């Protein structure tokens, strides 16, 4: 399957659908898409990885690099739809502890809503 990324928006959250294989060949394109979102002020991101078939070390590095960029901009990156192979890679590398995972997009979107509605402490 060819690599592709598409972006949708729901309120102040960008939903990024990633399909195919995320390897060294595709990681630059993925990075540019996330950086464009950040440059345009979209700092809350949900990665829908339902269609991601494979992830190599370059793809893992790109996920981490993009996550760090989002956090530095004051945003959050969450994931949904981990295929078993991708989930196993994230567990083996301990990255499942870094990326908040949700069972579906609705749950991930609700988690952003909960953050927006949380009381501000003085």
Residue ranges and their predicted role:
Residues 3, 14, 45, 75-78, ...:
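Conserved beta-strand core positions
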Residues 6, 80, 102:
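General small-molecule cofactor/ligand-binding pocket signal
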Residues 10-11, 50, 106:
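Conserved catalytic submotifs in the C-terminal HATPase_c
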Residues 18-20, 104:
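Active-site donor-binding loop signature of nucleotide-sugar glycosyltransferases
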Residues 103-122:
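A charged, well-structured terminal subsegment
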């Amino acid at each position: 399957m060819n690599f592709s990324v598409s972006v949708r928006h729901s309120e102040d959250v960008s939903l990024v659908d990633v399909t195919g294989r995320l390897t060294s060949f595709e990681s630059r394109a993925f990075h540019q898409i996330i950086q464009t979102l950040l440059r345009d002020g979209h700092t809350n991101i949900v990665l829908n990885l339902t269609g991601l078939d494979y992830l190599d070390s370059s793809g893992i590095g790109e996920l981490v690099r993009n996550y760090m960029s989002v956090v530095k901009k004051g945003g959050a990156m969450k994931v949904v739809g981990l295929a078993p192979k991708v989930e196993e890679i994230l567990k083996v590398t301990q990255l499942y502890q870094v990326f908040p995972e949700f069972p579906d997009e609705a749950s991930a979107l609700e988690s952003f809503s909960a953050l927006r509605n949380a009381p501000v402490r003085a």
